[in-house]
Amino acid sequence: MMVAAQVIWGSFSLLRVLWCLLPQTGYIHPDEFFQSPEVMAEDILGVQATRPWEFYPSSSCRTVVFPLLTSGSTFWLLRLWEELGLWPGLVSGYMLLVGPRFLLTALSFALDWAVYDLAPLWGADRWNALCLLSGSYVTLVFYTRTFSNTIEGLLFTWLLVLVSPGVVRSPTSKKPTPGPRWHRYLLGVILAAGFFNRPTFLAFALAPLSLWGIHRASELGGIRALIQEALVLLPGAALAAVLCVATDSWYFSSLSRSTGVFLTPANFLYYNLDPQNLARHGTHARLTHLAVNGFLLFGVLHAQALQAAWQQLHACLRASPQTGLSRVRGARGLLSSSKSYLLLFYFTPLLLLSAFSHQEARFLIPLLVPLVLLCSPQTQPIPWKGTLVLFNILGALIFGCLHQGGLVPGLKYLEQIVHTPDLSGTTTHYTLLFTHTYMPPQHLLHLSGLGSPVEVVDMGGAEDRVLCQALNNFSRQPACQLAGEPWPCRLFVVTPGTNRHALEKCRFPLKNETLLFPHLTLEDPPALSSLLSGAWRKHLSLHVIELETPVVTKQPKAQP
């Protein structure tokens, strides 16, 4: 059985790497591009990009440290190789997409290492836990993307690695064995780094740190000794905080050309603690994480966690003081069991994050590691294997391939068009208009940031009338003339098949049309009747349509 589990883990690990390089076409959320690679591509490679509001000095809500370490380091290496002539033509839309993802994919194997190390401590079967981890579509898709939540999950996992020996006993020891002193320094670094990456990291760290503190207090003989132990965390935390503040201050000061100290976590909290600001990003019911997002990400594993929590709560309620001392001791034993601790690690951050009205599924991806440890006990086989496999296949297909799946291939197609040299030697002006899609990450077009003849327009979910008016304006724009000389102009509209009827209302003549399959817009899914018709493929495709533009001719000069 162990050999079979090792083969399964190895197969899923290989799939994780190869699918990253393929690459995955699914587009989960704009934050995977606009909180890291889009910004770093503009800063380091000088390409045309859209800078989100969080990365302006006046509204600096995101630390630049982790974008610099991930996307930034990747783009710097690409630029260096190209400048040295080691790999001419290396920088392309494909490399700008896959480079940062490949780095995150490599870092995701730190999860596997951590689970391998943690499983014996928490009474989990090591290889069953690794199979659950590597086979989860959350690992295959979310942990290979440039989300700040991905970094948060990696830091939370290694926080568990550092505190677990001080909370539970190892199979070879009768009591918890805290690690060496430098572990506490590193723990302080992780706490500060996690807070600067996403202040919500404190919600994930609360339960492990609290249990670590309780156990250390009981071992050291009181609160005073615990305080002295906790002070050991301060040097690492202070060092990481100073480095983050210094990096953010240097970065945002260079953008604003003025010196100042920038505390990005404070700005993040100030913004997100305002309910009106959260409402702009979407308002959800308080039970969304518990009743929807947990199932969406983890499927039957979330159901197992809910069942285990109910059983644990029911057992504790039965062991009340009126039933005798032995029952009380039994209740304490339940509360101090590995299962109880893992349930705390899972449900404490989930419930704390539920206090906020804006709840997205990706906020919960750091909970994957404690969940797979909880659901792979050494004494029991993994239940519902078939359901679990089917669920993860479906999740991987939807979020890794289908969801907004035509947009990244569409940008690659447009990159080839705008970089094809004109045989006549004249410069062509391109207008790329996106409507009813997620924001297009412009850095994947690999356009020069200075004087680019390509204009990218994001219309969002514009109404039909607004779209037609915009097309009418762009087809007759003054940009098609430069210093009185005519420019060849090409106008492209990128829209899902479910919205193509809006373009037909505008009555613009079409020059050509390219369909990119598959593309599913969950915000505007195709009707069931259209999927059952013969045109189902058109409704599940992204349409890249070139419109005929009026020929702009140079007006003859008036004779004197």
From Swiss-Prot:
It is found in: Endoplasmic reticulum membrane. The keyword Transferase applies. Keywords: Endoplasmic reticulum, Glycosyltransferase, GPI-anchor biosynthesis, Membrane, Transferase, Transmembrane, Transmembrane helix. GO terms for biological process: GPI anchor biosynthetic process. One of its GO terms (cellular component) is endoplasmic reticulum membrane. It is an enzyme of class 2 (transferase). The chain crosses the membrane at residues 102-122, 126-143, 147-167, 186-206, 225-245, 333-353, 363-383, 388-408. Coiled coil: none annotated. GO terms for molecular function: glycosyltransferase activity. Pathway: Glycolipid biosynthesis; glycosylphosphatidylinositol-anchor biosynthesis. It is a multi-pass membrane protein. Its EC number is 2.4.1.-. InterPro entries: GPI_mannosylTrfase (IPR005599). PANTHER family: GLYCOSYLTRANSFERASE, GPI MANNOSYLTRANSFERASE 4. Alpha-1,2-mannosyltransferase that catalyzes the transfer of the fourth mannose, via an alpha-1,2 bond, from a dolichol-phosphate-mannose (Dol-P-Man) to an alpha-D-Man-(1->2)-alpha-D-Man-(1->6)-2-PEtn-alpha-D-Man-(1->4)-alpha-D-GlcN-(1->6)-(1-radyl,2-acyl-sn-glycero-3-phospho)-2-acyl-inositol (also termed H6) intermediate and participates in the twelfth step of the glycosylphosphatidylinositol-anchor biosynthesis. The presence of a fourth mannose in GPI is facultative, suggesting that it only exists in some tissues. Belongs to the glycosyltransferase 22 family. PIGZ subfamily. This is GPI alpha-1,2-mannosyltransferase 4. It comes from Mus musculus (Mouse).
